Amino acid sequence: MRLELLHRHRIRDSGLGLNEPSGLTLNADGSALYTVSDDTKAIFRLDLKGRVSVSDSFFISLDDLEGIALRGDDSELLVVQEGSNSVVVVDLNTRRERSRRPLSAMTNYDTIAHHFPDPPDNNGLEGITVNTRNNHVFVVKECQPGLLIELDSTLTTILSTRVLQPSQGFIHPELKAEKLDFSGLSYDSSSDTLWIVSDRGGACSSTTGQATLFSSASI
């Protein structure tokens, strides 16, 4: 697999609090993007050149946000909060939190609880995306170990979990396995696959929901 850089746009805007952009999601008609910054209690809407639309961005009573995804008809946003390892549903019309679902409150959490120390470390949930074919939600745990976790559409049940490990192709020539991180997720409906990005590895990987690696490329 080969990736080609088409354009690059700066989106960091410290004046607006967008200091550490984390996660990116495209709206249904492809006209705008949403992102979060883990040190700012806000949802930011951007145009396709990375410029923040102040009137369409809004504050929210949550911090430590690390990933974001639009769901359904663009009426709600799903964001992950790393510190609590929760999925938060935000109503885009009212700009308010609709619900908050910690992984620890979901059915089958006992099968992955040993991967999440208490109190939480800084290696929790980092990315989120929605499978638009069945509305299942995927979240990714950053590292130690990296986990790909599939949730049902109601965010009440953990359906499956896969450890992202060397035997599945998740390796980097310059990083030990325990140092490789997983920073973001995106679902590709055209091929029914997931894209996983690694910050430390500087790579983007294409995988199935069962964490079978198709291909990987440096970015």
Model-flagged regions — what are they?
Residues 41-44, 85-88, 145-148, 202-205:
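Structural signal for beta-propeller blades
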Residues 120-165:
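Hydrophobic, aromatic-enriched interface-forming segments
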Residues 1-3, 34-57:
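Beta-propeller domains
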Residues 2-16, 58-60, 98-121, 158-178, ...:
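Surface-exposed loop and turn segments in beta-propeller and other repeat-based domains
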Residues 27, 34-39, 71, 79-83, ...:
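Conserved beta-strand positions in repeat-built beta-propeller and related beta-rich domains
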Residues 15-29, 61-72, 107-133, 172-190:
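Beta-rich, blade/repeat-based domains predominating
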Residues 47-51, 91-95, 152-156, 208-212:
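Short loop/turn segments that connect beta-strands within beta-propeller blades
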